[in-house]
Regions:
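Active-site-proximal catalytic alpha-helix in oxidoreductases
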Residues: 147-155, 196-198, 210, 215, ...
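Short, small/acidic-rich helices and loops at N termini and domain boundaries
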Residues: 320-337
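A generic structural motif
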Residues: 76-79, 227-238, 284-293
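Glycine-rich phosphate-binding loops that contact phosphosugars or nucleotide phosphates
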Residues: 38-181, 195, 260-286
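A short acidic, often aromatic-flanked loop/helix-cap motif at beta-alpha or helix-coil junctions
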Residues: 140-145, 237-239, 292-297
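C-terminal active-site/capping subdomain that shapes the small-molecule cofactor and substrate pocket
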Residues: 243-325
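Active-site phosphate/pyrophosphate-binding segments
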Residues: 7-45, 157-253, 332-337
Length: 337
């Protein structure tokens, strides 16, 4: 039985459990590899990642992970059209899990009108009908639970396009499985962290390549737990956010610092001081860090863990982590207007 056959699409905890295995499901076809080889034959000025919600976050992870390795810009678009500076020397990677995301379809039409080089990642829908160079992915699971599928695909396509060494996702998956065995030992059990958020508001704080992890964690609390959450980036948050919490509001916050193994000295100092300032306010900040790991391992191990935290919080809040009723209603009304 393969990984996808083991997954229950109506059980979010089950889907999160299979996070590591989902990193290894997709193989890039010879046809797409050939297209990427053609793209490489000409100058590549930049890569633009297009998507919304769970389909966009794979681009953000790729952008932050590769930002210190590449000499070209990586840009994420969450909108109906592409910036004017994205021309035919860029590669546009459009991701829509359902294939029917209206903003992404609009951006694809915009790219086609401008004769841009595109790669589409989707399971079905309009994107697969009108797009060129489509990478087909399985459509069985919830879009936000499909993040490992989407990210491994987006990163691999980027590496192939730029002749970068391909990431060994089998090794990364094995690392994540070993990390999950440490939940309740090195890391608190996810239910323990979720209980800290019950009737409180999580504030995820990160810097550098862990910023998209904080953003993803915030979104997972919103969608899975039906619960408010926020995220912020150091150093920017030191110039505004730390003044934003009056005592009556601050007591409702639970700051969670996502720490990395490669923090620059000035960032390390800022995070330490920010932690102390929150302690001075009477808060109880939490620190999460994956020791002895490479950046990508840190990013994905924290993501896997925090995904499970969001599911446990949903259970505590008596929320259905699978349903997204308001998002569905908004889409229904948009389709009518």
């Amino acid at each position: 039985m393969d990984t996808l056959e083991k997954i229950n699409p109506q059980d979010m905890k089950n889907m999160v459990t299979f996070f590591p295995e989902l990193l290894n499901v997709i193989e890039i076809s010879p046809q797409i590899k050939s297209v990427l080889k053609e793209f490489r034959a000409e100058d590549i000025k930049g890569i633009c990642y297009v998507g919304m919600g769970g389909s966009s976050i794979a681009g953000s992870y790729t952008q932050y992970y590769l930002s210190d390795k590449l000499k070209i810009p990586l840009h994420v678009v969450r909108n109906y059209s592409l910036p004017k500076y994205v021309d035919n020397k860029w590669i546009v990677i459009l991701t829509s899990y359902s294939g029917n995301t209206e903003e992404t379809i609009s951006s694809l039409r915009n790219a086609m009108d401008r004769n841009l080089r595109t790669i589409c990642i989707s399971s079905n829908g309009k994107i697969t009908e009108i797009g060129k160079n489509v990478v087909a992915i399985p459509g069985k699971i919830q879009p936000r639970a499909a993040f490992p599928l989407l990210f491994s695909t987006v990163l691999t396509i980027t590496e192939l396009a730029l002749s970068e060494k391909n990431t060994d996702f089998s090794r990364v998956a094995d690392f994540l499985k070993e990390q999950a065995k440490l939940w309740g030992k090195v890391f608190p059990e996810p239910i323990e962290v979720a209980s800290l958020f019950h009737h409180k508001i999580p504030l995820y704080i990160a810097s550098g390549y862990l910023v998209p992890v904080a953003y993803r964690a915030k979104c997972q609390i919103n969608e899975n737990s039906k619960h408010p959450a926020f995220y912020s980036e150091i150093p920017e948050a030191n110039h505004n956010e730390i003044e934003g919490f009056a005592d009556s509001i601050a007591k409702e916050l639970v700051p969670i610092f996502l720490r990395g193994n490669n923090e620059k000295q000035e960032i390390l100092k800022r995070i330490d001081i920010t932690y102390d300032l929150y302690k001075d306010m009477g808060l109880n900040p939490l620190v999460l860090k994956v020791d002895d790991a490479e950046p990508l391992e840190e990013m994905l191990a924290l993501t896997h863990y925090l995904d499970m935290v969001s599911v446990e919080l949903a259970f505590l809040d008596k929320a259905n982590p699978v349903s997204v009723d308001r998002i569905s209603e908004l889409k229904r009304r948009m389709a009518q207007s």
